[in-house]
Structure formats: C-alpha cells, structure tokens
Amino acid sequence: MNPIRRRKIEAEAVRTVAMMILSGKVKDPRVHMVSVHRAEISEDGKNMKVFVTAICTDKKKLKVLSGLNSAAGLFQTTLSGKLGLRITPRMQFLWDEEYIQSLDESLRLTRKPTSAD
C-alpha cells in the first residue's frame, strides 16, 4: 500500500473512532472517556491497530478494550464508507502503553524537586 494512502487511512481512522465515541454513536456503556491516539494499518491494508487510553483502573481498562473491540464492525463500516475502501481493515483496539510511558516521563521531568529528593 502506498505510504501516503496508508497515513491518510490511519488519520481518518483516528478521527472517525474519536468522533463516534464523542458523539455517542457507540452505545456500549463500557466505552466512554476514551482517547484515541494513533492507528497503524498493515502493509496489505487488511488489519489495523488502533491505540487508545482512558483514565481508569486496570480492571476497567479490559472492559474498555472489550467494548471497543465489540464495536469494531461499526467503526470499520463507517471508515469504509467515508473513504470508499475496497478492502476494509479489521480493527483491533489496544492500550497505548507508549503514550502512557511518555506522559509519565514528561510528568517526572516537569515535577519540581522537593527537599526530600
């Protein structure tokens, strides 16, 4: 797949998923207050990983991912319709550990040292 086309599909996937969650089109109660960070489509365009986070416990995190993965068909259909895709990528939702780590690192660097440090 052309790299420019791939980036366009990934960007539209992030926008589409975020918009559908925020607008309430996803009725699953497990899916709320979710941030969509990035998407990665495979070379052949058949699979897509969508990376998300939410402010929640580890137990709730599994429920959020389960809710998103159960709504994947809705997201895929909407994305395919928007972009006119011949092959609709199968979406898999994953927790964005990389984003969490970078956020933790940023917080650690900006934290002011105290007398205990």
From Swiss-Prot:
Keyword set includes Cytoplasm: yes
Primary location group: cytoplasm
Pfam families, A to Z: RBFA
A single GO molecular function term of this UniProt record: ribosomal small subunit binding
A GO BP annotation: maturation of SSU-rRNA
Matching Gene3D superfamilies: 3.30.300.20
Superkingdom, natural source: Bacteria
Gene Ontology CC annotations of this record: cytosol
Presence of keyword Cytoplasm: yes
Compartmental location: Cytoplasm
UniProt keyword terms in alphabetical order: Cytoplasm, Ribosome biogenesis
Family per similarity comment: Belongs to the RbfA family.
Subunit structure, as described in the record: Monomer. Binds 30S ribosomal subunits, but not 50S ribosomal subunits or 70S ribosomes.
Described function: One of several proteins that assist in the late maturation steps of the functional core of the 30S ribosomal subunit. Associates with free 30S ribosomal subunits (but not with 30S subunits that are part of 70S ribosomes or polysomes). Required for efficient processing of 16S rRNA. May interact with the 5'-terminal helix region of 16S rRNA.
UniProt xrefs under HAMAP family: RbfA
Name of the protein: Ribosome-binding factor A
Name of the encoding gene: rbfA
